[in-house]
Each structure stands twice: as structure tokens, then as C-alpha cells.
Amino acid sequence: MRATSEELLELVNRSPAAVAIHDRKAWLELFSRTAVVQDPVGTAPHRRTVSGDGAASGDDPLGRFWETFIAPNRISFTSYQDIVIGDEVVRDVLIRSELGSGISIEVPAYLIYRTTEENGEARIEALMAHWELRGMVRQVIAAGLAGLSTMIQLGWRMLKIQGAAGLLGFAQGISRGIFGGGRRAVRNFAAALNARDEKALVGLLDGEETLIEYPAGVGESVQEFLDGAGRDLRIDVSGLTSAGWSSSCVFRANRGDVTHRGVAFFEFNPKTGKVRSARFFWNV
């Protein structure tokens, strides 16, 4: 039997709960045998390739992720909005971390959990955390010598636990991505839609294959969107974040007497920098 929205939300809530009390075993057991964690998006993903019995072993890529980024820190989450559509759960959160060195940082993030059923139970198949790695690094470095020491310690920890490939995979989240260009594109998307400037809107998109999901799970071509759900729609965006080749935001959409508030994700073509897809999540 397919899990209900309440059951899926309860499943993903167990993730920050396990992190808060440093229950490694409980956290690892939330994920499927083939789960992937990309935290943040833009860094190299951590993919499981082991069977069920070995899922929580030291060879588990998710276990190495835990030991690198969770074990030495105290992490808490404040959720501002939870959205469930189909098998996906989206959360608008603030992540607070007290690092092992004593430095405290706050990172706004949008989380996408994709779930699946495994042996009759709901499991997390993918966790994609959209937050800005550059912003986090700036917070740490702003602490002066303590911050510099913290970054050096993190680098050595990654090298020890994940090897050179893991360190380089994490660093690519700082050097590769859409960054400010993505945030500008999202603002321009909303402005063009609100102005009914179809030419400007189409100019932001990566050709005819660009899909608009409004709501998420219902993919349409740009023209179908403009002629249907996007007609007479006004969208305001805030809280823009870029991670890798994607940008995300909180949105408020109005069409007549109907208002939706949720989280949107824009994916960009790395070659062109144009919008490849736009997905709008709200509780329908």
C-alpha cells in the first residue's frame, strides 16, 4: 500500500531527529539500498551501492557522509514549510550548525526528499539539499583564525574519510554552478511572466524542450503553460538560493481568487545557462 502524505512527512522528519541526537544507525536506516544524498546540490553525490545487510557499515557512502559532516557537529533544523506531492517531500528550512571548533553558522535551505517503497516500508531514495556552499564558507571564514582552522580541519577530515576524490567533489560546489546568474534568471522569469512578456520569458528558456511543472508532477511545454495554468498568473519570488546548476526560491502565486505559496526549483543547462525546467511545489 502506498504511503500517505502524513507517513512520508513522518519519514523525513525522522532524519533531522536522528541527526539531532547523533543516532547514526537510525539515520542510515531511513534510506533505501540505492539511495543518493547530495548535500549541498552541486557537490559530488554520495551514492549507495551496497546491499541491505551492509547498508550501515563503514563502507557505506552515506556512512562516510555522516562521519564527515554530521558526526563532529551539532545540527538542528527549523522548518518553515513542508510540502508533499506524490512521492516527493519538499521542506523550506533553516539549518543551524555548531561546528566542532565552536563556530556557529546558519544556512537557509530547500530540501527535496524523493521516497520509495522497499520491503513494504517507505524509504528515502534521494535527498537533494539546495543551499549555498559559498555562503557557508564565507560565514566560517568571517570567524578569522578560528574559521580558517575549521576549514583546514574539514579538509583533512574529508581527505581522511572520503579520499582525494571526495575532497575534490565537495570543492566543485564552490567553483561550478549557475550562482548569481541563476538568481537573476528566476527574478527575470517572474518579471516576464507578470508583464506578459512572452518574448522575454522564452529568451530565458533552453528551447522547446523546457518543461514547466505547475504544480510539480504535471509537466507542460512553455506554450501549454502560458495558454493554461500560466495564463493571468502573477508570481512573486523571495529567498533565492543557487546550488550547482539549479536555483530555488519561495514563491507566492495569484490567479484570480486563488493563491498558492510554496517552493520552486529551476534547473539550468550548464552549457547555455538557460532554464531547462521549472518545478513549483505547493500542497495541492
Task: Give the positions of each predicted feature.
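C-terminal and inter-domain tail/linker signature
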Residues: 1-284
